[in-house]
From Swiss-Prot:
GO terms for cellular component: chloroplast. InterPro entries: Domain_X (IPR024937), Maturase_MatK (IPR002866), Maturase_MatK_N (IPR024942). Belongs to the intron maturase 2 family. MatK subfamily. The gene is matK. Disulfide bonds: none annotated. This is Maturase K. It is found in: Plastid, Chloroplast. Pfam families: Intron_maturas2, MatK_N.
Length: 503
């Protein structure tokens, strides 16, 4: 959102047709590919009156070009971009440019929505970890959870139709429709053999945007039904509905929905229903009965098929009881268990033993899938025994260590919310010994002799920032070190490490 800030100021002038001219500016695709650009230049010299001017845009993209040598040249290929052998490259370039352009109107809607709801530090809500404290507070009081596999649209035209409510630029939508139809048969866009919508890594930004736009349409109706059927209205659900990728959030729907759905609201008188979406799936948790959960199940299936033209089946929604079911969610295994405790009550000459059970929300790291991810990346075998990385043997020692340390710290950072740290210690051991084996293989030395020569230097490299600070200022037996072994949630994690994602 920051990299488009300069264009947002121009968009505020009311020129809604501003998007279409940007599509044909080759510099916009440089912006799409750039990640290290000094974004402050977008905030400078926008003009005193902030009116729309193609000259302002030209000056901005010229300044960006002066700091970026990555430019799309027509001489790179004489092939037709849609028919030539470079179609994968051009698909990536065009889709990333489209994604940057169509995202421009949405940050303004988000900012205005957050200002109305007086939400401070909204960037913290984008963190994946911000979901888990919510689950800790709510799931202890709920009984059932539904694992929902979100259906994908059966036709690309549905995605374009969804954007009509957000982007008032018919020319841009027509060109987007042409682009989607031109590539609709490519395996890199949609794989028809799978039951869910699959995004290409090369076109991920655009198609995640289109997919989230489509899903948000029926989620808006879902939030409306939830608020209408609940005596406790939620004022912030519009901003907290999707925290990861999607920008546009709204507060209310048009009043026509009240007439369409009033007849079925009596089915869903549930004041404790919570919804979370992630990675093409969603979770619907409730304090209600199995009958109520089944009503939600069949209603969602009919709602998707009749109103949004997506194919779904009841078997795609699994209803489980939280007390005896573990939930695999964003790289963690979450469960609600009972923590038994015995209380002795003394009354005069009589004493009583009272058995008491307290619900506890437990979150652990799934060690077997994580080791499987490490084995797939060639850090260890399927049994978890560390192996060397021959592909890294031609790098310098410092580069090899930095790469292993970066992976180790990223995994530790993401899985810091685990209530059991022993699994993380095993992962650190695998990465540390794999790094040592890689270095020993490079220097043609035995691993034991190489570790003896390095001593504790290699071990210190793999310590996280928190462990380094605690090792300096906190004694090993203090309560602060025991506190570190508890769950820690970070508000700066907006993506999942590939090794942590076992989906």
């Amino acid at each position: 959102m920051e990299e488009s800030q300069g264009y947002l100021e121009l968009y505020k002038s009311g020129q809604h047709d501003f998007l279409y001219p940007l599509i044909f500016q080759e510099y916009i695709y440089v912006l799409a590919h750039d990640h290290g650009l000094n974004r402050s230049i977008l905030l400078e010299n926008l003009g005193s009156d902030n009116k729309f001017s193609s000259l302002i845009v030209k000056r901005l993209i010229t300044r960006m070009y002066q700091q970026n040598r990555l430019i799309i040249s027509a001489n790179d290929s004489n092939q037709n971009p849609f028919l030539g052998h470079n179609k994968d490259l051009y698909s990536q370039i065009i889709s990333e440019g489209f994604a940057v352009i169509v995202e421009i109107p949405f940050p303004l809607r988000l900012v205005s929505s957050l200002e109305r709801k007086e939400i401070v530090k909204s960037h913290n809500l984008r963190s994946i970890h911000s979901v888990f404290p919510f689950l800790e507070d709510k799931f202890l009081h709920l009984n059932y959870v539904s694992d929902i596999l979100i259906p994908h649209p059966i036709h690309l035209e549905i995605l374009v139709q969804t954007l009509r409510y957000w982007v008032k630029d018919a020319s841009s939508l027509h060109l987007l429709r042409f682009f989607l139809y031109e590539y609709r048969n490519w395996n890199s866009l949609i794989n028809p053999k799978k039951s869910i919508f699959v995004f290409s890594k090369r076109n991920q930004r655009l198609f995640l945007f289109l997919y989230n736009s489509h899903v948000y349409e029926y989620e808006s109706v879902f939030v409306f039904l939830r608020n209408q059927s609940s005596h406790l209205r939620s004022t912030s659900s519009g901003a907290l509905l999707e925290r990861i990728y999607f920008y546009g959030k709204i507060k209310h729907l048009v009043e026509v929905f009240a007439n369409d759905f009033q007849a079925i609201l009596w089915l869903f008188k549930d004041t404790f229903v919570h919804y979370v979406r992630y990675q093409g799936k969603s979770i619907l948790a409730s304090k209600g009965t199995p009958l109520l959960m089944n009503k939600w199940k069949y209603y969602l299936v009919n709602f998707w098929q009749c109103n949004f033209y997506v194919w779904s089946q009841p078997v795609r929604i699994y209803i489980n009881q939280l007390s005896n079911h573990s939930l695999y969610f964003l790289g963690y295994i979450s469960s609600v268990g009972l923590n038994p405790s015995v209380v002795r009550n003394q009354m005069l000459e009589n004493s009583f033993i009272i058995d008491n059970a307290i619900k506890k929300f437990d979150i652990i790291v799934p060690i077997i899938p994580l080791i499987g991810s490490l084995a797939k990346a060639k850090f260890c075998n399927v049994l978890g025994h560390p192996i060397s990385k021959p592909a890294r043997a031609d790098s310098s020692d410092s580069d090899i260590i930095d790469r292993f340390v970066r992976i180790c710290r990223n995994l530790s950072h993401y899985h810091s919310g685990s209530s059991k740290k022993k699994s993380l210690y095993r992962i650190k051991y695998i990465l540390r010994l794999s790094c040592a084996r890689t270095l020993a293989r490079k220097h043609k030395s035995p691993v034991r002799a190489f570790l003896k020569r390095l001593g504790s230097e290699l071990l210190e490299e793999f310590l996280t920032e928190e462990e380094q600070v605690l090792s300096l200022i906190v004694p090993a037996s203090s309560t602060s070190r025991r506190l570190y072994r508890g769950r820690i949630w970070y508000l700066d994690i907006i993506c999942i490490n590939d090794l942590a994602n076992h989906e």
